[in-house]
Design a protein with these regions (language model features):
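A short acidic, glycine-rich active-site loop
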Residues: 55-70
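Charged helix-capping and loop-helix junction motifs
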Residues: 128-131, 203-206, 258-263
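Local beta-strand N-terminus motif with an aromatic residue
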Residues: 1, 109-111, 141, 155, ...
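Structural beta-alpha unit
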Residues: 23, 40, 77-113, 214-264, ...
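Flexible loop/hinge segments that line or gate small-molecule binding clefts
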Residues: 146-154
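Short glycine-rich, flexible loops that bind phosphorylated cofactors or substrates
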Residues: 121-122, 167, 252-254
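Small/aliphatic-rich secondary-structure junction motif
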Residues: 1-56, 157-222, 238-241, 269
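Hydrophobic alpha-helical segments and helix pairs
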Residues: 97-147
């Protein structure tokens, strides 16, 4: 975990995420923080399709770039006193955030992305969502989402929210092991399911997960409940969890519309930092 990419729009929420990233970098022994701001000089009016009657608004790209760089420099100056041994670089680009991040992952050899998430009303979540949520939906890399009211504390207790079907279909376990080897935290494994019991395939998954994680001496917890998100958040509160780890499986358009993503709901509804691993 040498390089951490921190996304910022210079809001208080983004500042909190950047401060958390500095703290996290120390525990992960990361050597570099890259502060990144994506701005758009071309932006459609009211987020509707461009037509001859409703043209796009074009801002002065040079002015936007200068302002972005100035704000990034201020942010770096604010963070550096608490970032001993960590290099803080800055980067600003005129691009769509999700596209820019995808390019930077390989170009800058990024190991982890950190973004803030502001609390929103249910209507705002439905209508506009969040940059962080959109990045999560498109990501193929580890992403930490930091709620605006998250506490900045050492990673002493970590909760791994397990969905066996998602783990079985994906390749997240290797990334999970790398994270666990880095943070050296007390591990709680939580699976929330209804009382229908486990299939023979799931029982094999459980056995495999025990074998994989036993060296971390985790606490395995199997909870019967139909509300997965509430159960996980309640468990996190009761056990003073420092971070929740969840595996996110990207879905097609129809699945996105008709299925609820537990990882997305956790991002919206938890006040604990959430580490998303791609399935």
């Amino acid at each position: 975990m040498q390089t951490i990419l921190v996304l910022t729009d210079f809001s208080n929420v983004a500042l909190r995420a950047a401060q958390y990233a500095i703290h996290l970098a120390g525990q992960l022994h990361s050597r570099r923080i890259l502060l990144f701001n994506a701005y758009q000089s071309l932006e459609p009016v009211s987020n509707v399709p461009v037509t001859p009657e409703l043209p796009i608004i074009q801002a002065n790209p040079d002015e936007l770039y200068k302002e972005s760089i100035m704000q990034l420099d201020k942010l770096r100056d604010l963070l550096e006193p608490t970032a001993a041994g960590i290099t803080i670089d800055t980067l600003s680009e005129d691009d769509i955030l999700e596209e820019a991040v995808r390019k930077l992952i390989s170009k800058e050899q990024v190991d982890l992305v950190v973004a803030g998430l502001a609390d929103k009303s249910n209507l705002e979540k439905f209508l506009v969502g969040s940059h962080s949520i959109r990045v999560m939906e498109s990501c193929n890399y580890p992403l930490v989402i930091v709620p605006e009211d998250a506490r900045i504390t050492p990673l002493e207790k970590v909760l791994l929210a397990v969905d066996f079907e998602t783990l079985r279909r994906g390749k997240a376990l290797a990334g999970l092991v790398e994270i666990l080897n880095s943070i050296h935290a007390e591990l709680y494994v939580v699976n929330v399911a209804s009382d229908e019991g486990y299939s023979s395939e799931t029982k094999e998954d459980i056995q495999h997960l025990h074998q994989l994680l036993d060296k971390y001496h985790p606490s395995f917890n199997y909870v019967e409940d139909t509300n997965v998100v509430n159960s996980i958040n309640e468990f996190a509160a009761e056990h003073d969890i420092s971070m929740i780890i969840a595996v996110h499986e990207k879905k097609g358009l129809l699945a996105t519309i008709f299925q609820k993503s537990v990882s997305k709901q956790l991002a919206w509804n938890s006040n604990v930092p959430l580490l998303i691993l791609p399935a």
